[in-house]
Amino acid sequence: MGHLPQSLYSAAGPKFPYPGSSGLGVDQRKLTWSRFPVFLRCASTESLTSLTQNNAAEIELKYLVSQHGWDVRRLNRDDEDEIRRVSLVQAEAFHIPLALFDDFFFMFFQAEVLSALLYKLKNSPPDRYACLVAEQTSETETLSSSSVVGVVDVTAQTESSVLRYFPGVEEYLYVSGLAVSKSQRRKKMASTLLKACDVLCYLWGFKLLALRAYEDDAAARNLYSNAGYSVVETDPLWTSTWIGRKRRVLMSKRFS
């Protein structure tokens, strides 16, 4: 099992700063290595069931998914620079710019994101939480932590507010914190990250993925719909009257 760099080990457990949103620049307001890491060159029609025929040949391969010019793998817990890079990608995606002292507040926001990431890496079993990172496919260069330009979190959960819609299901994987660097958006990286979540769901033996998006974030909802997610519920109307609160939709994707 991997470990965190000693200099990053003492992290508090803050509330994660961006529940139910995606860092795709549309609306800025959920294994150490798996025992079965998969290198999957995905076609749009390829199903997860095909993986059962190839596990033996794929056990030693590094990436969960490789498509559209992106490779997706698990975050390297031993790489302090990579951990900080991931927190920067997420902070830049979810930070809401301010008119005054923006740099100052961004610094604190990034520190909060980093603290939340460290807490989850330190306290979550390796088969219950994974931070997946995307980097550009390169066959000639050695990629460094600075090459990480996309990230998504996947966490095993048992919230009754979600499971009540799925009788017989005891737990699910929650997808959150999907973030893509501004310079790399509209290049199908987010779709590739979501495909990696599908693969991880299969490898861990789960049958259900869930996530939340803002109701008025059409781009994010279209992304999730195209990835196979469907709306399960929408927040009640009265929630939109709360100051600073926007209505969200719960979306899910189920595997047979």
Curated annotation (Swiss-Prot):
Post-translational note: Autoacetylated.
Protein name as catalogued: GCN5-related N-acetyltransferase 10, chloroplastic
Broadest EC class assigned to this enzyme: transferase
GO CC terms in record: chloroplast
Enzyme Commission number, as recorded: 2.3.1.255, 2.3.1.48
GO biological process terms, semicolon-separated: N-terminal protein amino acid acetylation; peptidyl-lysine acetylation
Transferase listed as a keyword: yes
Catalytic-site annotation from UniProt: Y224 (proton donor)
Quaternary structure note: Oligomer.
High-level lineage: Eukaryota, Viridiplantae, Streptophyta, Embryophyta, Tracheophyta
Main location: plastid
Transit peptide extent on chain: 1-41
Tissue: Expressed in green tissues.
Family from the record: Belongs to the acetyltransferase family. GNAT subfamily.
Organism: Arabidopsis thaliana (Mouse-ear cress)
Residue span(s) of domain N-acetyltransferase: 106-256
InterPro entries (alphabetical): Acyl_CoA_acyltransferase, GNAT_dom, N-term/lysine_N-AcTrnsfr
Main function: Protein acetyltransferase with dual specificity triggering both N-alpha-acetylation (NTA), with a preference for leucine, methionine, serine, valine and to a lower extent threonine and alanine as substrates (can also use glycine), and epsilon-lysine acetylation (KA) of several plastid proteins.
Subcellular location: Plastid, Chloroplast
Transmembrane segments: none
One Pfam assignment: Acetyltransf_1
Binding-site positions, acetyl-CoA: L178, A179, V180, R186, K187, K188, M189, A190, S191, D217, A218, A219, Y224
